[in-house]
Design a protein with these regions (language model features):
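Structured, basic alpha/beta domains of bacterial-type, RNA-associated proteins
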Residues: 1-136, 140
């Protein structure tokens, strides 16, 4: 079962939030929160807040065990841009764009997903002869 939580109009640029979100995608929730707590980026606090909220939604609304939750994905979408102007010389001005983003964390109970066994391709047969001997034959 997938459970989600959203945070809108977060005052972090989407580009910086995506850098943090890519690190924790696919991790177990407890491990992701531990990693986020040690990250120095400002967006780590906001991403952690959304992940904690999604885990709390799963725990309280759907009676799922917090230790079995897997962070499926963290979506970062661009929000509205706050525009400000900085006065410059001779009556001109520079634009300042304060970007915002919308965050959505999706967690799921990792026992719901069936575990797949990857079929391994057969390895090519290794030649019985010594590779060094074949190099000597080619030089002659």
């Amino acid at each position: 079962m997938q459970v989600q939580a959203t945070a809108k109009w977060v005052r972090v640029p989407p580009r910086k939030a995506r850098l943090v979100a890519e690190v924790v995608q696919g991790m177990p929730v407890t491990e992701a929160l531990s990693v986020l707590s040690f990250m120095t980026q400002a967006a780590a606090g906001d991403v952690g807040k959304v992940v904690r909220s999604a885990a709390a939604n799963a725990e309280n609304n759907f009676n799922l065990d917090r230790d079995r939750l897997q962070l499926l994905r963290v979506d970062v979408d661009g929000g509205p841009i706050i525009k400000r102007f900085r006065p410059r010389a001779r009556g001109s001005s520079y634009s300042i764009f304060k970007r915002t983003c919308h965050l959505r964390a999706v967690v799921e109970d990792n026992l719901d997903r069936p575990t797949r066994q990857r079929a391994r391709a057969p390895r090519p047969a290794v030649a019985a002869s010594d590779p060094a001997a074949s190099v000597d034959d080619e030089e002659e």
